[in-house]
């Protein structure tokens, strides 16, 4: 720490650095999936029987696969080759021995002669995957935007050219410090290597020798590679902390709610003074509201004088989700066209909602005539009215801060949909029933990036939000299988063996990432309370 006053450096994300190196913009996921649906419908022809809402879920999966391919600089043409050609491929020189073995393992379990109906459907789609991939990138680039992985790959391919490198590097600061990274994809790694070669990059990793130097420990999988490839500005003696004596307590509860109640006694204990050096960490973000409900109110023993929450939270668990659902149901299912009035059962749901008293009741019961554009404008208007009501609160509590952020995210998504509907090149001229289902799916999939004031009081965080942060005392809740790591599964249309063979993200990598999060979280702590549920009807330990 400098004894003299210094100017604070500028802070940015890795994504910000890539964006400085390109004139292209980053396409929103909603726009990308809708464009992909249009291309899919053209390519598959009569075989494309899915409506947009039916396509959307696995369209997101397909887009995530394309994103992963580009971020790992994989050869998409070879990956999406005809399965017969892939099986007969003799030149495997671009694969490591482990990747070559994974590819051979795939064909041991994929019988081309006796393929099932599901395999035939997979083969039918697979034959068009490269065309979908390349046409999406072409269509987006013509509009001056790309999905993130394609944009990052475009930057790396250009900066590798000697003629463009110097001009591109001039757009970046003279010195760049990379701090706290763990898992790197190939585009990030390539950019770091280019900056290191130009003597403009400095690397500060966050690790412990306990798991990093043990080859069998999955938590150090990526750190071992990073240190070997890029080096470190700090010597290893800075990173021997886990071996120091810590006070670790394991607490078993019979059901989930008891974990939230345990937090109350933890707050009341002498070992948990209310400072920003102490944190409650949730392995399951859906438990945030039960936790907040269990914390003592002002004036009660154990009530923290200051408290801050920083974590992702599912929008479907907030009142704005049920509010929008009630409005959409009213307009799409609740209107009797013969009687020219809304059905009581559907209207009653809206009238009972806590947000109903915040809106213009007369406007809320105007029928939108089955028009999608009018429906979205109707929803946006009412969401704005609710948001305006919350804006009058001078010092919102944690609940109110969370709900304000949920309202903002909902308004943002509705605005995006409206703008897409007004465009001619996006296939959102759909039946209202399709739009209704799409709205529900989109809202249910939103995770609210809830950020409070980290410099104040006790911290409540999800596991991801604790990265690069250290706490003296911690209470970790929901430390159970399926919650840490959180429901890790392969959400991909690319088979696992092929993902391994072409160097894409695999389940093994995801597990290693969460193992690192856990060890890094506790490596400098003095006291840690770990709480798990042992009930037979709950998550297994």
What do the PLM-derived regions correspond to, one by one?
Residues 2-170, 186, 366:
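Basic/charged alpha-beta structural segments of nucleotide/phosphate-handling enzymes
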Residues 132-153, 174-177, 242-254, 502-506:
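Acidic/glycine-enriched edge-of-secondary-structure segments
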Residues 160, 164, 197, 268-272:
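Residue-level signal for alpha-helix termini/capping positions
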Residues 169, 176-230:
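Extended, H/D-rich, highly charged conserved domains that either
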